[in-house]
Amino acid sequence: MSIIVTGSIATDHLMVYSGRFTEQILPEALDSISVSFLVDDLAIHRGGAGANIAFNLGCLGLAPVLVGAVGADFAEYGQWLSAHGVDVSAVHVSQTKHTARFLCTTDSDQNQIASFYPGAMSEARDIELKPIVDRLGGADLVLIGPNDPAGMLRHTRECRDLGYPFAADPSQQLASLEGDQIAELVEGAAYLFTNTYERGLLERKTGWSDEDVLERVGVSVMTRGAKGVTVQRPGEPVVSVTPPQELAKADPTGVGDAFRAGFLAGVEWGVSDERAAQLGCMLATLVIESVGTQEHKLEPGTFMERFSEAYGPDSAAEVADHVRG
């Protein structure tokens, strides 16, 4: 059986403008803006939470099944994911829309002008999980990551109705969801992933307390930035893990996705919550050291050396055979 990852699939188009936006935008003409910036650099990165998580699971030697919606322009991206161990056979290809993309221009003052085109992502709501699970002969876990909100709700209901164990990872979509929708996404999840801000937002919108959340999920996993992560199970002591020291801090984008992949790999391998969280933190550290969410390389030997330095040889011995395949 496999881990199924549902979530967004997108590309990031990042441009750099050497001037200052404020020198080109006239305050007295804000009601009729028409400006163009000659940019100096363009970087295109593969992204989307679902694709990032699946990519990192593939790097750890698992064979995740990615479920999401893309456009006909996905072919090259799909080949990249396949080459890194991701099963993309369940990805829906839109006949009318392009793959979602984020376009952002940053000026010399670090001001940004950005746009997000959801595109084919809106068709994620048309994907049915049952035929995919039937073809696979079952699923160990379905991760429901940030995506088209209607698609997230559909997939959660389907998991609940058909008895598929699922992990809730609403992430940035919490901001646009109502409390009752959030409750529906979370109730009965085997795992709930949030960061500290998202956890506060979830509790405010649902009216739940920490205890209420723990009563509704099997395991609560909360990332805390540089402070690491806490893992809670109802009635058990909290597990806290700090991240390894990074060699450089290049770009935090995609760090949370990498953590989720590492943690879920640990779940799939049957290791403890602490060990799973350590795997997630180690993988997240690799991502923060590179620009782009899928630009890092996971060399098993180096990965395990750093893991052992951070968490000790006994901890490393428990996961080494899995990481090295």
Name what the model sees in each region.
Residues 1-65, 76, 248, 314-325:
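Glycine-rich phosphate/adenosyl-contacting loop at the front of the ribokinase-like
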Residues 7-8, 68-72, 93, 106-108, ...:
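Cofactor-binding loop segments of dinucleotide-utilizing enzymes, especially the Rossmann-like FAD-
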Residues 58, 160, 268:
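Gly/Ala-rich phosphate-binding loop of Rossmann-like dinucleotide-binding domains
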Residues 63-90:
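A glycine-rich beta-to-alpha transition motif near the start of alpha/beta enzyme domains, typified by
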Residues 89-94, 102-141, 145-146:
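Conserved phosphate-binding/catalytic loop of the ribokinase/pfkB sugar-kinase fold
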Residues 160-165, 171-240, 248:
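Conserved phosphate/ATP/ADP-binding segment of small-molecule kinases
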Residues 207-325:
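Conserved phosphate-binding/catalytic region of the ribokinase-like
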